[in-house]
């Protein structure tokens, strides 16, 4: 059985975070715990053990951490740039026609739906848009969907009738 140890994560921006881990846990589990408390996406986190950057796919044991030791980590947050990213809108009708959209990570879903209306004539109310397997929801921003350059948006429309 894997021994349980305490992990303490400190950051300039948040209060001290403490939780339990085992040597078989991956660093990504710590990243996910931090995300649940801070809303900082895993891709925007850098965890440091002393000056060594921890890689999300590796187990804690691969860093030679003593079983009995409390792990003290430092969280750094990388602010992603807010430049315009080229995304491709794929329509479910019109033989999968593609449209290039230039979207910022800070763009609201409502703004993106207005862009979609300008190229497809489908009003936002009738649009169902998915990105990275998630339905875009009003009130959110595109950073919530982990968009990257070249990400695909899939457009379908609400059916009218029964």
From Swiss-Prot:
Q: Tell me where it resides.
A: Nucleus; Cytoplasm
Q: Name one Pfam family in it.
A: ubiquitin
Induction remarks? Rapidly degraded by the proteasome. Cell-cycle regulation with highest expression during the S-phase (at protein level). Over expressed in hepatocytes by drug injury (e.g. DDC; diethyl 1,4-dihydro-2,4,6-trimethyl-3,5-pyridinedicarboxylate). Inducible by the pro-inflammatory cytokines tumor necrosis factor-alpha (TNFa) and interferon-gamma (IFNg).
Q: What happens when the gene is disrupted?
A: Spontaneous sporadic apoptotic death. Higher sensitivity toward endotoxin challenge. Abrogated TNF-alpha-induced NF-kappa-B activation and reduced induction of NF-kappa-B-regulated genes. Impaired TNF-alpha-induced I-kappa-B-alpha degradation and nuclear translocation of p65 in RTECs. Reduced expression of LMP2.
What biological process terms from GO does the record include? aggresome assembly; myeloid dendritic cell differentiation; positive regulation of apoptotic process; positive regulation of canonical NF-kappaB signal transduction; protein modification by small protein conjugation; protein ubiquitination; regulation of mitotic cell cycle phase transition; response to tumor necrosis factor
Q: What does the UniProt keyword field contain?
A: Acetylation, Cytoplasm, Nucleus, Repeat, Ubl conjugation pathway
In which domain of life is the source organism classified?
Answer: Eukaryota
Q: Mind telling me how this protein is modified after translation?
A: Can be acetylated.
Per the record, the similarity remark reads: Belongs to the ubiquitin D family.
Q: What does this protein do?
A: Ubiquitin-like protein modifier which can be covalently attached to target proteins and subsequently leads to their degradation by the 26S proteasome, in a NUB1-dependent manner. Conjugation to the target protein is activated by UBA6 via adenylation of its C-terminal glycine. Probably functions as a survival factor. Promotes the expression of the proteasome subunit beta type-9 (PSMB9/LMP2). Regulates TNF-alpha-induced and LPS-mediated activation of the central mediator of innate immunity NF-kappa-B by promoting TNF-alpha-mediated proteasomal degradation of ubiquitinated-I-kappa-B-alpha.
- This protein is called Ubiquitin D
Q: Which organism is it from?
A: Mus musculus
Q: What is the lineage of its organism?
A: Eukaryota, Metazoa, Chordata, Craniata, Vertebrata
GN (gene name):
Ubd
